[in-house]
UniProtKB/Swiss-Prot annotation:
The reaction(s) this protein catalyses: apo-[ACP] + CoA = holo-[ACP] + adenosine 3',5'-bisphosphate + H(+)
Annotated family: Belongs to the P-Pant transferase superfamily. AcpS family.
Name used for this protein in its record: Holo-[acyl-carrier-protein] synthase
Nucleotide-binding is among the record's keywords: no
Cofactor(s) for this UniProt protein: Mg(2+)
Top-rank taxon, per record: Bacteria
Keyword Ribonucleoprotein in record: no
Binding annotation for Mg(2+): 7, 55
Length: 124
């Protein structure tokens, strides 16, 4: 089965995240935050793109969920490699679900000035 998810976000929503550490830590892991610091370019665009990626994955997984699982946005980690491609690292119940269902997850993120968009495809 294949499923897709897509999310678009206004980049401006994330300006205050850089000034509010608690807000940043509510949605992003320490590893993600460190990854933002290493990245060149706009940190705000990167924040928005990774948030959109998390939302896209939730949308893609929702038709596959046969029962409710408990997860938070920090259980879905989005890390960009040195090559520039973003990848999901899942934790806790959502990771167990992905392993049990033998899911392959594909992600692409793009941002342009005011908007960030992410597209996810899931197959098993």
């Amino acid at each position: 089965m294949k499923s897709i998810g897509c999310d678009i976000i206004k980049v401006g929503r994330f300006k205050n995240f850089l000034e509010n550490k608690k807000k940043l830590e509510r949605f992003f892991t320490h590893k993600e935050i460190e990854n933002f610091k290493l990245k060149g370019g706009s940190v705000i665009e990167s924040l928005a793109g990774k948030f959109a990626a998390k939302e896209s994955l939730i949308k893609a997984l929702s038709p596959l969920l046969q029962h409710k699982i408990h997860y938070g946005l920090k259980d879905i980690e989005v890390i960009k490699s040195l090559k520039g491609n973003a990848k999901f690292y899942l934790h806790n119940e959502i990771e167990k679900f992905a392993i049990k269902m033998n899911l392959k997850i594909y992600l692409t993120i793009s941002h342009e000035k005011e908007y960030a968009i992410a597209f996810v495809m899931v197959e098993n």
